[in-house]
């Protein structure tokens, strides 16, 4: 196709057709995960489940991404397809378990299974995208994945708005409808691995069982991941617990926080459309720094906000700005890694981000349980500012490769 014609059609026209279908296949998993997150963080507190327990479940799920490192090595050596299929196939199990009980022991088991599923998917997904793209279409590919992913999660966040209507139509209690809807979402999530299996039938990989674990770019990976982990550490104090914070501070149920998270994710998805254009104009590093920096200002403002509607508006803006940097960061890391290093690189970056995030989520839940609703935002702001400064100073002269 003529390059000028392709440019007029937009950035996303450059993405391989099969990759687009792979991105769409994850929609069913993501919708289910979206509703599950609202169920855990907004509906559980309504049932009287302590914020500390909510933080523990989220933290345990996140901690399981430690498995991403050995799974990432395995994906580089043996191939990525099987691991992705296994990970997406596990997702329905914990969702249905959580719908059927509030027994803490069972919930812990479910959180661990969900973490294992996420580890298998995260250790392969970014590498699969990078393997099928070049420097010309990589930013657009990661952005489309980010947009579709966040849009489908947003749909899951929105589902609690249906519950009052379903109550009036069926006469069932809110608790039963919440639970039945989560079971339905678990069943819907099973569509993803079936669809992926069909799409990936002809996907060819070249296993490299003798490949060295540490490649030439390993020091760069450790530096990038270490700095990025400070974002994860700061975010953990409050971001996964936003619905819990809204309920405890303002008394808002999931019929408010669910749509707010949905609006936030839709805004994030729309904002990510601009990500490739911003990086094309200013460069990846400057684009990442600018979006994260402006987001941090809005993060700080949430510590002092007195009104729930204002809090919702500020949170949406903060989320959109911060997450515009998400696909750009993924694209940047995959661009500075060789093809043979990408599975491990994606895994290490995920683990180093999620482990601190998981720990501080538990701490954040405990802080919220004491009634100190501002401290988590102050802590998050400090770590964001340190990470953004270090990222710019360390990576401003390092360019991605094809």
Regions from the language model: what does each represent?
Residues 67-79, 271-284, 368-369:
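Helix-to-loop junctions at the C-terminal end of transmembrane segments
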Residues 143-164, 352-360:
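Glycine-rich segments within core transmembrane alpha-helices of 12-TM secondary carriers
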Residues 56-73, 262-274:
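Central cavity-lining transmembrane alpha-helices of secondary-active solute carriers
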Residues 82-97, 286-301, 378-381:
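Structural signature of the two symmetry-related core transmembrane helices
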Residues 27, 94, 105-121, 310-324:
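Hydrophobic core of transmembrane alpha-helices in multi-pass small-molecule transporters
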Residues 66-103:
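Conserved MFS/SLC helix-loop-helix module at the cytosolic interface between two early adjacent transmembrane helices
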Residues 8-65, 222-261:
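Helix-loop boundary and gating motifs at the non-cytosolic
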Residues 112-149:
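Cytoplasmic helix-loop-helix junction between adjacent transmembrane helices
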């Amino acid at each position: 196709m003529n390059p000028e014609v392709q440019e007029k059609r937009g950035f996303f026209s450059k993405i391989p057709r099969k990759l687009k279908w792979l991105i769409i296949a994850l929609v069913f998993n993501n919708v289910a995960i979206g509703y599950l997150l609202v169920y855990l963080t907004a509906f559980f507190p309504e049932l009287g489940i302590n914020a500390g327990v909510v933080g523990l479940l989220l933290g345990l799920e996140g901690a399981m991404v430690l498995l991403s490192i050995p799974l990432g090595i395995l994906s580089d050596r043996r191939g990525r397809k099987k691991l992705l299929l296994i990970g997406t196939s596990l997702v329905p199990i914990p969702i249905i378990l959580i719908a059927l009980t509030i027994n803490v022991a069972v919930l812990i088991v479910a959180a661990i299974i969900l973490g294992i599923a996420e580890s298998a998917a995260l250790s392969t997904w970014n590498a699969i995208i990078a393997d099928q793209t070049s420097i010309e279409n990589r930013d657009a590919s990661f952005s489309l994945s980010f947009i579709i992913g966040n849009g489908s999660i947003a749909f899951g966040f929105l589902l609690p708005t249906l519950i009052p209507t379903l109550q009036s139509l069926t006469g069932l209690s809110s608790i039963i409808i919440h639970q039945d809807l989560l079971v339905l979402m678990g069943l819907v999530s099973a569509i993803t691995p079936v669809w992926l299996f069909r799409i990936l039938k002809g996907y060819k990989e070249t296993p490299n069982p003798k490949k060295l674990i540490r490649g030439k770019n390993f020091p760069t990976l450790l530096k990038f991941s270490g700095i990025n982990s400070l974002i994860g550490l700061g975010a953990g104090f409050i971001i996964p617990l936003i619905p819990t914070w809204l309920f405890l501070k303002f008394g808002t149920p999931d019929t408010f926080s669910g749509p707010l998270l949905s609006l936030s994710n839709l805004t994030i998805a729309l904002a990510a459309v601009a990500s490739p254009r911003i990086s094309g104009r200013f460069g990846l590093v400057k684009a990442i720094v600018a979006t994260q920096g402006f987001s941090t200002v809005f993060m700080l403002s949430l510590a002092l906000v007195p009104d729930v509607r204002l809090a919702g508006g500020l949170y949406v803006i903060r989320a959109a700005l911060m997450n515009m940097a998400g696909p750009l960061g993924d694209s940047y890391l995959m661009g500075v890694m060789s093809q043979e290093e990408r599975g491990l690189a994606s895994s290490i970056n995920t683990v180093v981000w999620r482990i601190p995030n998981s720990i501080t989520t538990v701490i954040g839940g405990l802080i919220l349980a004491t009634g100190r609703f501002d401290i988590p935002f102050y802590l998050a702001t400090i770590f964001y500012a340190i990470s953004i400064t270090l990222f710019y100073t360390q990576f401003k002269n390092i360019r991605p490769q094809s």
